[in-house]
A protein has these predicted regions:
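Generic anion/oxyanion-binding catalytic loop in active/binding sites
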Residues: 1-2, 136
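Gram-negative outer-membrane beta-barrel transporters
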Residues: 2-84
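Conserved C-terminal beta-signal and adjacent last beta-strands/turns
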Residues: 48-155
Length: 155
C-alpha cells in the first residue's frame, strides 16, 4: 500500500564522559516526530514502527593496574518508546527497556596492542517484549538473551 509522503523531524543527543581514569559513561536520547503528510486516509497519522522516544545509558569500569589490568566490565540499558502497530494508528506496541553487559579483556599486556577478547550479553535479564507489529496480524517478539563472544586481533 503506497504511503504517500512522510515527514520526519527530530533530534539525537549523545554525551560521553570519562568520570575517572577507570569509569566511562555514555548516554543518548532520540526524539522523532514523524507523520504522514500527503495521504488521503493517513494524513496526520504517525508511521508504524517509529517510536517517538528512544534512550540508552552505558557505563564501564576498566582496571588499569594490578592483576586485573586490561579488564573492562560494563553494563547499560536501552529504552525503546511505544510506537503504532499499523498506519491507521489503531493500536500501539508498548515501550520496552532491556539491559546489556560486557566483559572485555585488552591483550596489550601480552604484546598484542589493539587486540582484545570480549563477551557481550544482550537482553541480560531475558526480558520478553513485543518489538514490532506488522498490521494487526503479525507481531514479533524482541530478541531473547544473546551471548556473543568476539576476538579482535590487530597486527
Amino acid at each position: 500500500m503506497p504511503a504517500g509522503e512522510i515527514r520526519a523531524r527530530g533530534v539525537e543527543l549523545e554525551a560521553k564522559a570519562a568520570l575517572t581514569a577507570n569509569i566511562n559513561m555514555t548516554a543518548s536520547y532520540t526524539y522523532t516526530d514523524a507523520e504522514y503528510t500527503k495521504d488521503t486516509n493517513l494524513k496526520g497519522n504517525t508511521p508504524e514502527q517509529v517510536p517517538e522516544h528512544m534512550a540508552s545509558l552505558w557505563g564501564d569500569y576498566t582496571f588499569n593496574q594490578g592483576p586485573l589490568s586490561g579488564l573492562t566490565l560494563g553494563t547499560g540499558g536501552r529504552f525503546i518508546g511505544s510506537s503504532y502497530g499499523d498506519p491507521a494508528n489503531s493500536f500501539k506496541v508498548g515501550s520496552a527497556a532491556v539491559m546489556d553487559a560486557v566483559i572485555k579483556y585488552d591483550l596489550a599486556r601480552f604484546g598484542m596492542a589493539g587486540s582484545s577478547i570480549a563477551v557481550n550479553v544482550n537482553n541480560l535479564l531475558d526480558r520478553e517484549y513485543v518489538a514490532s507489529c506488522f498490521q494487526t496480524y503479525g507481531c514479533f517478539w524482541g530478541a531473547e538473551r544473546q551471548v556473543v563472544a568476539t576476538a579482535t586481533f590487530r597486527f
